[in-house]
Each structure stands twice: as structure tokens, then as C-alpha cells.
């Protein structure tokens, strides 16, 4: 493979034994595809498919008036260009959205004649109507809602369709399995069928009161006869004068115990009474030609009649269907001359009489009576009129407006009831209901299997697009009602469509969904990995999903169908465990919303390169081998038996039977888990913590690539959108810290477009978690780029790879108890070198409002503040950028009018003399919070339309315009240079008819002449050839056009910046100040590795006291070795060994460079590193210069990749260690034979430790749980209103709770005075508190405890119960 520009700088040595068959897909594909399909903005209106917005409009329109003579039709919709781009929306606090305009027709009909009912079109009015704003997705797959970045999480919900299950014997004490079925539509009423312990079958609608299922069957038009015919086969009898004859059916007799002697037609006894009928008996009966068997009278009694029996003479019904035979009934039948009789066939084993028994409990007589019963159940208390009854029943399951199975539901339904085809009506039919009841009865009879609701074939994913569409539909449905009401008026009044449609309900529905839905979440932006994971999250919670409290263990557990679809490792700890999952690396969604995963096709034991994506249901049909199955050179499976999966179970099968094979060993895990090296050696619980904590790593000042990675780092960084990648290839024309200008290759430049790409980099931008988003260029001027190359690194990336921590030299050893219980000991050098220093950006906002007493003002003129306190504010009262501020410093001066107070005579006099004084305003300035300090890095001022801008606001606008003009000038410069190059090529050597500097007619134009003429005068040259003249003219026109378009763009930008800002109601001016806070590593900060090995920094030790090696190098971090064995995360030990090898190899390369070794020598050593084991790298693509520059990048350590489940073996680590540390070097460093341990020396005494210590490099992270954010202290502060006790929590500046158990402790010590103080003056004794304050001021230290306020609250509580309680003071 060819190396990209960025990869050439540093190649990661991979130990993967298998080449990738399938590249890791774009990780945000699911989100972006779903929303693109919802909007269909780049599809011509006529070509749009019926999904997303198009489907929502189609479902709501046409709207017809009540009398049917006015109709509103939908034609098409268009999306307007958003008014502000993403960055502008973020700074102004707006929503990045596009206006939807729908073209609708208002059609008014007329009657053809006064008598006829047929209609003719009277007039048609067409108009574009505003239909609310739809938020747009950014390039990174997120949304900007009110200025904050949010993510819509996909939802995993139960797929529509029909499901069969049983209660696992939990309902009834006998442990009997009660079967049930449920038809779940996408929209509409749920229909449940369930057996009760007496084996009667009931149904219920929307979990209401249950009713016998026969009522529903009658309501869909079945008679008792047809119900029985549908569920039972019949036994045919012939009535004799005494007894009867039964038709002989061998299958029904076999296995039964004879209740009487069974004889053949000759009268010979074949089966004696009380004997079991066997296959031999039935064969004998068949051979004797027996068609009927004589049965005694009592055999008939209790049998159930299958059809109505009618008296042939009178037409009277003697016996109704489902009636049991009795002696008197048989007598009646004989006397009426009835000979043939049909009874339903039932038995105890596999043909229960459930439907027959249910039918007997039901008293309704016909279809209408059944529907009335259903109406009464749905609408108790309402009178059942015929129209209302029929309308309700139609609306329940047969009306497309109220019931929608959806395409998925119909597909699942048909598959379940065994119908061919995946399509059909979206409402239920009578056959559907009957089919479900039949399957349920079969289940009770022991045929078939129940569904597993946790199977991913029964759970589907609802994506952003679908969720947004549902909201838009809701909004349209609300509009539909309002429009229907008003359509009648359109006949009389000349109304246009926009008079009828009010878009507010749509905007409200979308606003509520994007702003407040449980699935619309504040984006986790701590680092790039957190962003990507958040967008790939799949949640079972949310509207229409599960709730935490109701979700049982089964739903949360890992299911076999999660393989390759949902990660078995990454899920939160705590109440949401298993309910929130992460999509696996290669997983994608199919058209129905089910998760699919890719497999390679295997034919006759040979693995092909064909790849099929299988859903969970399809996968169950095949035998699938694992990705690590051994193959020979031709790609055939080796060995007689291959480890494979069949129907979810792991088995060994012969190679010929294998039909598919996994595409990659990492296929089963998510992005975060696939970034953990040696994941296969970690316990799953610790791997879960490791994956979760990687997302909490804070971006540090100088990101450093992980020495030991997995090879997914680059994909994750690029797909997260944190790094800047080249959209087109070209040459870097200009680079500075804020922008990169690329001149695009001619081949990739589009004709008529500017061949320049300008990448403006993000500088010190605040993320949602207050971390710092910052991009740094990694290209130089003149570099050649290809499309997709990384041109700038972002937060937590290093040369285009994710880098969330630092490589630290780790020693596993105890050190004076400072690493007890997972504490971490840190070398002071780490802090001094700022290895874990991070920048956090805080946004502080102040608003000047219009109050009743007058407008607040942002000003420098603040009462009672000294000049020193104001010295950093400019004349507008806003702090300068670059000022370093401490707690309590004024950032923005603001004064608020005070209420009128009664003035003393003296004040009145002063006022009369000096006019209005500052006493009528109070200082409400924005100050730095307690406990935070930092540097002001940016200020933004927003002013309401119509209010004079202050100087500072104007200055900010001017700076922004200057920056924008610079961009345009750069583009113009490159375009002009390109144009003049083309002109030079065009004119050189041509004949001219004349031109500047008295160019003679017929003279040849040469380079010397062109160099002597001002470039802009080249257009005045008159070439002799017409074609050349035309080309020159077209170049001139295109240049002028480009200039004109740039001027327009600048004008538009200026207009945007100078127009007033949209601010909340009553706000005149808003100032945002951004503070950058540097956080150094300190005791109390939480740190972790990638294997779930977390801990808290306990002490920062001077370099000279740390344990050191024989060559004097000291450990960066000392960890407790007891943290490894019990937690079973051995991956960290292997990572340490391999990291140690990487560092050693880097040092060897550094030594070679220092000794100025030849490039060929360095190349040979690199060949040994990269190509002696593991995956081979083609270093011949790099020339000598590139090899040396790559060697320079490798001096800090050679990066390794050990892919998940396909990583470096122990032997490979050993080989690398021996290559990195030859004998002489190992001795110099005091390493053991294995090179994995070293003898260390105590920094304080210089003595050698007795035993060798495991030492090496691990990628260690600083997590976003910083002691500075958690540390909090209070002396006095706010108190709760009712109880007068101090509030709790840092946010409320609260106190520490001295709870019940702490009181017990003081009681146990007998510390009476301390206890009294705790419960009174330090808590809620209001009088006592003030007295203590007074005594402290006076220098006395006496305490007078009074009555705690909470006692008074208790007394009041008791009184409210009507008990008169009083405190008697003695």
C-alpha cells in the first residue's frame, strides 16, 4: 500500500498476522446517512423517495375540508441556505438550521350542477409556505442547538411485528407456562393474546381489560362454526340405534389407551380394552379394510359438536356448534333421524380444546354484539350507537391514519406467520389476526418455539432521521387539524395557503425534540474518542423504549447476536449497564433498521474476497468461522475441524461445511475497546472500565502518540473530525498558526472555481466539557499533499493519530505506602515538563437588561472601586484580552439602577449641590469566581438591534473583517498568479497586432517583453490570432468575475457582522469573556491506564528521591504491583514490556543519527524492526531523505500496533526487547536476562533494591476528574429556607453533612460539647449562630447553644397532624 504524506513521517509497526480484508468503514456513517435520507436536500424534488420529510408531508397532505369542496395538496419542499454557518451559530447562541418551504396548492371545487354531486375544479392557488426550521447536521455528525453542540443518540427499540412468548412459569404457582402473543405496530394500538391458568384464551387492546378471544374472532366476522372449523379437525360419527360408529383415522388412534374393545369390520377384537394402541394395531386395522370402528354410547357423551345440527323436516336447530353431547341430546338427534354427526377432535397431548372452551365462556351472539363488547371495553360509560361502534372498530386496526405496522412490521409479521414476500398492507387484516391466534394455539399444543425478545433480529435501531421525521409528523398532524377547520372558510373568503397554515406547531415539536428529548444529548466533547463514541451510541432508553427501573437482567445481558453488531465490552457501569451500548467497529444498519455485520464468503473450504453483510436473523442460517481460523497460501481453511459458530453456539465443524468467516478479529468490539492494546489479556470488567475511562482523558498541552497502539488510532482521529484533512490534493502555499493555504492540483481543480483551499484552524475554542479545542498545522510550505492527508492536528491527536495520554516510564513496586490502594506516585519531572498540563476554558457571561427602574449599563464607571481594581478594563468597561486575573477581579463592569430610597437631609443637600450622584446605582459587575484564575483569551460583545455599539464591539467586528479580507486576498493572489501563468503560456511566441510599450504590429511576443510589462497590462496586448484573443478575453472575464464574487462575499460578511444580534427578551447587551485556566498535575487528580487500572495521585516526589536505574534514568510513575493479579488485567504488563522495547529501539535510532550514520545503515536497521516479524512494511517507497526524517521522528520511540485479538505474541515481544537492548546496553541499564525487569536503586539512600522490578513504558492518561474542580471549603454561606441548615454541594457553596452515623461516632466517644456544637450553632440554631459570631468578635470563646430550627419544623409538622404539641420551658 502507498503511504500518505502523514504516514511517511512515522510508520506504526504492526504485529497483525492478517491483512485487512475490509477497511474500517467511516465511523459516523450511520448518523450522517440517516439524516441525509431524512432531508434529501441534494435530490431534485421530483426524484425524492418517500422517506424522511417527503414521507411526513405525504402522510399529512392532501387535507380536505369537511364538505369535500376545498382541498390542500402538497407539491414539493425546498430547504433554504442557512443564514449563519456553524461557527457563527456557536458564538451567537443560535441554532444551525435551514428553513423548510413547502409549495402547496389550494384547490377549490364547484358542483357540476345544482343537482349533481360530482365536482369540477373552480380555482387553484399555488404558493410557497414556510414550514418551520429543521436543524442541519454539521460535518462532524452533531447539531448546533442554541449555540451548543448536541448529539442525537440512536435508539434500540422492539421492532414492530408479532411476538410470541411465555411467562417462564412465573405467573401461576404451579409453574405452568402461560403463552402469549403481541402484535406491536409502529403507530397504533397494541393487540395482546394470552392464555390464563385455566387454558382459556383472552385478548386485550392497549393493555386494557381482557376479554375472551372469541369476541374478537366474532367481531372480524367469524361464526362459532367457522371458528371451530379454523382451529379443529373433525371426527365423523354415524349414529346407530345403540352406540355409534366412528371413522377410523390411524394417526389419531395411535398412542391412545383403548376405553373399549376395538374390533375390525369382521368383529375380531384387535385392541383389548385398557391396552395402548400401537402402530402394529393400526396397520392390522388398515389391512383388514376397516373404515369405521364401533364405539359405545358413553364414548360420545361430552364430545363437542362441530357444526349446527338442523332438523331436516322443521329446519329447527337441534344442536348448536360447540355444544356438548348429552344423553338427551343424542335421543333428540336419533328421533329427528340424524345419522351423520361431526365432533371436533381433541386430545390431552397436542390438540387442546382451548378455543372451544373459550367460546363457551363468551355470551355474545353475533358480529355486532362482539363489536359492542369491544366498544364498551375501550370507552366505558359511553352509549354504543351503531355508527360509533363500527367507526371505533375500524379505527383500531384497519385505518391507515391511526394504525401503521410500517414496512419493518409487515416484513417481520409475514416472516413470522410463514407468508411469502416482505410487503403488504400497513394495516391488519382479518387473516392476520386469525393467523396469530392459530400460531399461539399451536404453541400451547407444543408445536413451534417462542421468540427471544433480546435477539437483535427482534430489536431495531431508530436513527436520527427517523426520530426527527416522527417529530415533524407530529407537528404536521397538529397543523392538519387547524387547517381542516379553516378550509371551509376558503370557499367564501379569498384566502391564500399561507393564511391557513401556521408553522408554529412544527417549530415547537422540533424544538422540543432537539432541545429537550431524552435522546438529544449534550455532546461529550472531552476528547475526540468521546465524540465518536457518543455518536455511535445505541440506547434502549428514551420515549417508546425501556425505563431503567423496569429493565430486567435479560435485556441488559450480552446476547449471542451482539457478535459483530454491538460491543460486549463498552457500556456504562451503574444503573444504565447494558441499556446503553456502542456499535461494533464494522456494524451498519440495513434498510429496515436492523444491525448488520460483514462476513467473507467461504466456498468449499476456500475463503473468497466477497463480503456479505448479514443481519442477526440471516446469520442464524449459516455456519461462520472466526477471523483467526488458519488459512493456507491459497486461502483454504487448514485442519479437519474448524472452530465456528452455528445458531449462536460455538462448535467444531469440518472445513467444507463453513459458509462464512469473520472479516477481522476486531469486528466484535467498539471503537473505544479496539483502541486498547492486548485487550485479549484483560478481564472483561476491567476492559469495560478502560474503554469508558479513555473517553474521559483530558487533552494535554503536547499530545503524544501511544507507543503501543492497535492500528485504529489514525482512523479514529480522522473520522472524529478533530484533525483537518485535505479536501483536494495540491501544494501548500502558505502556513501560519491560524490558517493553511493550499494551491489545488490542476487535475482536481473544477473549471470556473477558485483553485484554492483555505483551512482556517480552530484556536483555543471551548468544548462542551470546558476542555481546549486547538488545531496545529503539521505541514510546511511547499509540501505536496494528496486528498485525505492530515494537514493539521487537533486536540488529543499527534500526526493524525489519537493521542489521549502520555508515554510514561512505569515501575511496578511499592514505595513507602504511597501507592497503597491504587494510589499513584509521580516524578516531579513530569510536572516540571508540563507532560500532563491541560488548558481548560471557562465561559463567563454577563447581560445588561432593561429593568423597571431603567436600563443596566456596561461601563467603566463603577461606584466604590479603586482605580487599581479598574486598571485592566478598557473605556467600555470590558477587560483586555491577555489579562491574567485572580478570584474576585472585575471582568466586565456593570451597574444596575437602585430603587428610590428615602434620603437623609445631608444626602439631599449633597445631591442639590452636585447633581445626580452614583448613589442611585449598585455594582453588579462580572467577577472571577472563587477558586478559579486564568488568562482572558477572548471577549465577544453582542448588542441588540438599534442600540449604539461601544468601541470594543466595533473593534471586534473590524478585526473579524480584517481576517476575512486576508482570506479573500490570499485566494485572489493565487487565482491571479494562476491566471497570469496561463496567459504567459498562451502569449509566449505568438504574433501580436499591437500592445503596450509600442509593441509593433506583427512582432513576436517573448518572455523578455512580458517581464517588462506590468502584468495587468497584459490584457491590453492584441494577439493576431482570433482564438488566442478569445482565450485572453475569457481569462480576463473570469478574473473580474472572481473579484466581483469576492467583493460580494465580503459585503455579505460585513452585513452579517454589523446587523444587530438576536438576544433573549429584555437583554440589551451581552458580553462573553473566555478564561483559559492552566491545570497542572497535582495530588488528588485521577489518572488511569487503558486497561481499567485507575488511581489517584498521592504524592509528587522530587526527581532525586525517585527509584532510578543503573544508567541514572528515573521512573516517571510508580504503581503498586498488587493492582495487577487480582484484577486480571495483564494487558498492562504486556503493554509495559512492548513500550520498553519501542523506547529502546528509538534510542538506538537516535544513537545512529547522533553518530551520523549513513541512510543505508539506518534503512537496514529499520528493515529489521519493521520486516523481521509481524506485518511487513514496504520501506522502498521512502527515499533516503524521507528515511532520515522518519528516523528523527522515531527517536522518541518506535510506535507499535498490536491489533485487538491479533496482537503481538510473547515471543515477538521478547524478540523486540532483545533487538532494542543488545547485551552490552542491557548490562549498562541493569536489565535482567529477559530485558523485562531492571535492578533499581533507591533515590534517597542510593542502595540497590533487593529484587529486580518490572519497568517499561505505558500510555497513561489524566482523567477529567480534577481535584481543583472537586475541592471545596466553606465557613459561612447560604442556608436552606425552611430548616435553616447549610445547603450541600460545591455548586451551592454548601457545607459538609454531619449525618446520623457521624453523630453516633461522637456519642460513642462521649464528646458532648463537640456534639452539641455540631447539632446547634454549626447547623441550624439561628440565634446561637449570631451569638457565636458576636463572642468571637469580642475575643471571647463561649458558646450558648439555643433551639435548633429543625426542632421547630418538627413541632409544626406534628401540629399539622392535629396534635397539639407545646414545648414547656422550665
From Swiss-Prot:
What the entry lists under PROSITE patterns is as follows: RNA_POL_BETA (PS01166)
- Any Gene Ontology CC annotation: DNA-directed RNA polymerase complex
Is Transcription one of the keywords UniProt gives this record? yes
One GO term in the molecular function aspect is: DNA binding
A Gene Ontology biological process annotation?
Answer: DNA-templated transcription
Keyword terms: DNA-directed RNA polymerase, Nucleotidyltransferase, Transcription, Transferase
Q: Which InterPro entries match?
A: DNA-dir_RNA_pol_bsu_ext_1_sf, DNA-dir_RNA_pol_bsu_external_1, DNA-dir_RNA_pol_su2, DNA-dir_RNAP_su2_dom, DNA-dir_RNAP_su2_hyb_sf, RNA_pol_bsu_bac, RNA_pol_bsu_CS, RNA_pol_bsu_protrusion
Report if keyword Transferase is assigned.
yes
How does this chain assemble? The RNAP catalytic core consists of 2 alpha, 1 beta, 1 beta' and 1 omega subunit. When a sigma factor is associated with the core the holoenzyme is formed, which can initiate transcription.
**Name of the protein described by the UniProt record:** DNA-directed RNA polymerase subunit beta
Q: Which organism's genome codes for this protein?
A: Delftia acidovorans (strain DSM 14801 / SPH-1)
Amino acid at each position: 500500500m502507498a503511504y500518505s504524506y502523514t504516514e511517511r513521517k512515522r510508520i506504526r509497526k504492526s504485529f497483525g498476522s492478517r491483512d485487512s480484508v475490509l477497511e474500517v468503514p467511516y465511523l459516523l456513517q450511520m448518523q450522517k446517512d440517516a439524516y441525509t435520507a431524512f432531508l434529501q436536500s441534494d435530490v431534485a424534488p421530483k426524484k425524492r423517495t418517500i422517506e424522511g420529510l417527503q414521507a411526513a408531508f405525504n402522510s399529512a397532505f392532501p387535507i380536505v375540508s369537511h364538505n369535500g369542496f376545498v382541498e390542500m395538496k402538497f407539491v414539493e419542499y425546498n430547504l433554504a441556505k442557512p443564514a449563519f454557518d456553524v461557527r457563527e451559530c456557536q458564538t451567537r447562541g443560535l441554532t444551525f438550521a435551514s428553513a423548510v418551504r413547502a409549495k402547496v396548492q389550494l384547490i377549490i371545487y364547484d358542483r357540476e350542477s345544482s343537482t349533481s354531486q360530482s365536482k369540477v375544479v373552480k380555482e387553484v392557488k399555488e404558493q410557497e409556505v414556510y414550514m418551520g426550521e429543521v436543524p442541519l447536521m454539521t460535518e462532524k455528525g452533531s447539531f448546533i442547538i442554541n449555540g451548543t453542540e448536541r448529539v442525537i443518540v440512536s435508539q434500540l427499540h422492539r421492532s414492530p411485528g408479532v411476538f410470541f412468548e411465555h411467562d417462564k412459569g412465573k405467573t401461576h404457582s404451579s409453574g405452568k407456562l402461560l403463552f402469549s402473543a403481541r402484535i406491536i405496530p409502529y403507530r397504533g394500538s397494541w393487540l395482546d393474546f394470552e392464555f390464563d391458568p385455566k387454558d382459556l384464551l383472552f385478548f386485550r387492546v392497549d393493555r386494557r381489560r381482557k376479554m375472551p378471544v372469541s369476541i374478537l374472532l366474532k367481531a372480524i366476522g367469524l361464526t362459532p362454526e367457522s371458528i371451530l372449523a379454523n382451529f379443529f379437525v373433525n371426527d365423523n360419527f354415524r349414529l346407530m340405534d345403540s352406540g355409534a360408529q366412528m371413522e377410523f383415522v390411524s394417526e389419531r388412534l395411535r398412542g391412545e389407551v383403548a376405553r373399549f374393545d376395538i374390533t375390525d369390520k369382521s368383529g375380531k377384537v384387535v385392541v383389548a380394552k385398557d391396552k395402548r394402541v400401537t402402530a402394529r394395531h393400526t396397520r392390522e386395522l388398515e389391512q383388514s379394510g376397516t373404515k369405521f370402528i364401533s364405539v359405545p354410547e358413553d364414548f360420545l357423551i361430552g364430545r363437542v359438536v362441530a357444526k349446527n345440527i338442523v332438523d331436516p323436516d322443521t329446519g329447527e336447530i337441534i344442536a348448536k356448534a360447540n355444544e356438548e353431547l348429552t344423553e338427551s341430546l343424542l335421543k333428540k338427534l336419533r328421533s329427528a333421524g340424524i345419522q351423520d354427526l361431526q365432533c371436533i377432535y381433541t386430545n390431552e397431548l397436542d390438540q387442546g380444546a382451548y378455543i372451544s372452551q373459550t367460546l363457551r365462556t363468551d355470551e355474545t351472539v353475533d358480529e355486532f354484539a362482539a363489536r359492542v363488547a369491544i366498544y364498551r371495553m375501550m370507552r366505558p360509560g359511553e352509549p354504543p350507537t351503531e355508527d360509533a361502534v363500527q367507526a371505533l372498530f375500524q379505527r383500531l386496526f384497519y385505518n391507515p391514519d391511526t394504525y401503521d405496522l410500517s414496512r419493518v412490521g409487515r416484513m417481520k409479521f409475514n416472516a413470522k406467520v410463514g407468508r411469502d414476500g416482505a410487503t403488504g398492507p400497513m394495516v391488519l387484516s382479518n387473516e392476520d389476526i386469525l393467523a396469530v391466534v392459530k400460531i399461539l394455539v399451536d404453541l400451547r399444543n407444543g408445536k413451534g418455539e417462542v421468540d427471544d425478545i433480546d435477539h437483535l433480529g427482534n430489536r431495531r435501531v431508530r436513527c436520527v432521521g427517523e426520530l426527527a421525521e416522527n417529530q415533524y409528523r407530529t407537528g404536521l398532524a397538529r397543523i392538519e387539524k387547524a387547517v381542516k377547520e379553516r378550509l371551509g372558510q376558503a370557499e367564501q373568503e379569498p384566502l391564500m395557503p399561507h393564511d391557513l397554515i401556521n408553522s408554529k406547531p412544527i417549530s415547537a415539536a422540533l424544538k422540543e425534540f432537539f432541545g429537550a428529548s431524552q435522546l438529544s444529548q449534550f455532546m461529550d466533547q472531552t476528547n475526540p474518542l468521546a465524540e465518536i463514541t457518543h455518536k455511535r451510541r445505541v440506547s434502549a432508553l428514551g420515549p417508546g423504549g425501556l425505563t431503567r427501573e423496569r429493565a430486567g437482567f435479560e435485556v441488559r445481558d450480552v446476547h449471542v447476536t451482539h457478535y459483530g453488531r454491538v460491543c460486549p465490552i463498552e457500556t456504562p457501569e451503574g444503573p444504565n449497564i447494558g441499556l446503553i451500548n456502542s456499535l461494533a467497529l464494522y456494524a451498519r444498519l440495513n434498510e429496515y433498521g436492523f444491525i448488520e455485520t460483514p462476513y467473507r464468503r467461504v466456498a468449499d473450504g476456500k475463503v473468497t474476497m466477497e463480503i456479505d453483510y448479514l443481519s442477526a436473523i440471516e446469520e442464524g442460517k449459516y455456519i461462520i468461522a472466526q477471523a483467526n481460523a488458519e488459512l493456507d497460501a491459497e486461502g483454504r481453511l487448514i485442519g479437519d475441524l474448524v472452530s465456528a459458530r452455528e445458531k449462536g453456539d460455538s462448535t467444531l465443524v469440518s472445513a467444507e461445511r463453513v459458509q462464512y468467516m469473520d472479516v477481522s478479529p476486531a469486528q466484535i468490539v467498539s471503537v473505544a475497546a479496539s483502541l486498547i492494546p492486548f485487550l485479549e489479556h484483560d478481564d472483561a470488567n476491567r476492559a469495560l472500565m478502560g474503554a469508558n475511562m479513555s473517553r474521559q482523558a483530558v487533552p494535554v498541552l503536547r499530545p503524544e502518540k501511544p507507543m503501543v497502539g492497535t492500528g485504529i488510532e489514525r482512523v479514529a482521529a480522522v473520522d472524529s473530525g478533530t484533525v483537518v484533512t485535505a479536501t483536494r490534493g495540491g501544494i501548500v502555499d502558505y502556513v501560519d498558526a491560524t490558517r493553511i493555504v493550499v494551491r489545488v492540483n490542476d487535475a482536481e481543480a473544477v473549471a470556473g472555481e477558485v483553485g484554492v483551499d483555505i483551512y482556517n484552524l480552530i484556536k483555543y475554542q471551548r468544548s462542551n466539557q470546558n476542555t481546549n479545542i486547538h488545531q496545529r498545522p503539521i505541514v510546511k510550505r511547499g509540501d505536496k499533499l494528496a486528498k485525505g492527508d492530515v494537514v493539521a492536528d487537533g486536540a488529543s491527536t499527534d500526526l493524525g493519530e489519537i493521542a489521549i495520554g502520555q508515554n510514561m516510564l512505569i515501575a511496578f513496586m511499592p514505595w513507602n505506602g504511597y501507592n497503597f490502594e491504587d494510589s499513584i506516585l509521580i516524578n516531579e519531572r513530569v510536572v516540571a515538563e508540563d507532560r500532563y498540563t491541560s488548558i481548560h476554558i471557562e465561559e463567563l457571561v454577563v447581560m445588561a437588561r432593561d429593568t423597571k427602574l431603567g436600563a443596566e449599563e456596561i461601563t467603566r464607571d463603577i461606584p466604590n472601586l479603586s482605580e487599581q481594581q479598574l486598571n485592566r478594563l478598557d473605556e467600555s468597561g470590558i477587560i483586555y484580552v491577555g489579562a491574567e486575573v485572580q478570584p474576585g477581579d472585575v471582568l466586565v463592569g456593570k451597574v444596575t439602577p437602585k430603587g428610590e430610597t428615602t434620603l437623609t437631609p445631608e444626602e439631599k443637600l449633597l445631591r442639590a449641590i452636585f447633581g445626580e450622584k452614583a448613589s442611585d446605582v449598585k455594582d453588579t459587575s462580572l467577577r472571577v469566581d472563587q477558586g478559579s484564575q486564568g488568562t482572558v483569551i477572548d471577549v465577544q460583545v453582542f448588542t441588540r438591534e438599534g442600540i449604539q455599539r461601544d468601541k470594543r464591539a466595533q473593534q471586534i467586528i473590524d478585526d473579524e473583517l480584517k481576517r476575512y479580507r486576508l482570506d479573500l486576498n490570499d485566494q485572489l493572489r493565487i487565482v491571479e498568479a494562476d491566471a497570469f501563468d496561463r496567459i504567459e503560456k498562451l502569449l509566449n511566441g505568438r504574433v501580436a497586432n499591437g500592445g503596450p510599450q509600442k509593441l509593433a504590429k506583427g512582432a513576436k511576443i517573448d518572455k523578455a517583453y512580458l517581464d517588462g510589462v506590468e502584468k495587468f497590462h497584459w490584457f491590453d496586448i492584441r494577439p493576431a490570432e482570433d482564438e488566442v484573443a478569445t482565450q485572453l478575453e475569457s481569462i480576463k472575464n473570469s478574473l473580474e468575475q472572481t473579484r466581483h464574487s469576492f467583493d460580494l462575499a465580503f459585503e455579505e460578511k460585513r452585513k452579517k457582522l454589523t446587523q444587530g444580534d438576536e438576544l433573549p427578551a429584555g437583554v440589551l447587551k451581552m458580553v462573553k469573556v473566555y478564561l483559559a485556566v492552566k491545570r497542572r498535575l497535582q495530588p488528588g487528580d485521577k489518572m488511569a491506564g487503558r486497561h481499567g487500572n485507575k488511581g489517584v495521585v498521592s504524592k509528587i516526589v522530587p526527581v532525586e528521591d525517585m527509584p532510578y536505574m543503573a544508567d541514572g534514568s528515573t521512573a516517571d510513575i510508580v504503581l503498586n504491583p498488587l493492582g495487577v493479579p487480582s484484577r486480571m488485567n495483564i494487558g498492562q504488563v504486556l503493554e509495559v514490556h512492548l513500550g520498553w522495547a519501542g523506547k529502546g529501539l528509538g534510542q538506538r535510532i537516535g544513537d545512529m543519527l547522533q553518530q551520523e550514520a549513513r541512510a543505508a545503515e539506518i534503512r537496514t536497521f529499520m528493515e529489521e524492526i519493521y520486516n523481521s516479524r509481524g506485518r511487513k512494511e514496504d520501506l522502498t517507497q521512502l527515499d533516503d531523505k524521507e528515511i532520515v526524517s522518519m528516523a528523527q521522528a522515531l527517536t522518541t520511540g518506535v510506535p507499535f500496533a498490536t491489533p485487538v485479538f491479533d496482537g503481538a505474541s510473547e515471543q515477538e515481544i521478547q524478540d523486540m526487547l532483545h533487538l532494542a537492548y543488545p547485551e552490552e546496553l542491557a548490562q549498562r541499564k541493569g536489565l535482567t536476562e529477559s530485558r523485562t525487569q531492571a535492578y533499581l536503586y533507591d533515590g534517597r539512600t542510593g542502595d540497590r533494591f533487593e529484587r529486580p522490578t518490572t519497568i517499561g513504558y505505558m500510555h497513561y492518561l489524566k482523567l477529567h476528574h480534577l481535584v481543583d474542580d472537586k475541592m471545596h471549603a466553606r465557613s459561612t454561606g447560604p442556608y436552606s429556607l425552611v430548616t435553616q441548615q447549610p445547603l450541600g454541594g460545591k455548586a451551592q457553596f454548601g457545607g459538609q453533612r454531619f449525618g446520623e452515623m457521624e453523630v453516633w461516632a461522637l456519642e460513642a466517644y462521649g464528646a458532648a460539647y463537640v456534639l452539641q456544637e455540631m447539632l446547634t450553632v454549626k447547623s441550624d440554631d439561628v440565634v446561637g449562630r449570631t451569638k457565636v459570631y458576636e463572642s468571637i468578635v469580642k475575643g471571647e470563646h463561649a458558646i450558648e447553644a439555643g433551639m435548633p430550627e429543625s426542632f421547630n419544623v418538627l413541632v409544626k409538622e406534628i401540629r399539622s397532624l392535629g396534635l397539639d404539641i407545646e414545648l414547656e420551658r422550665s
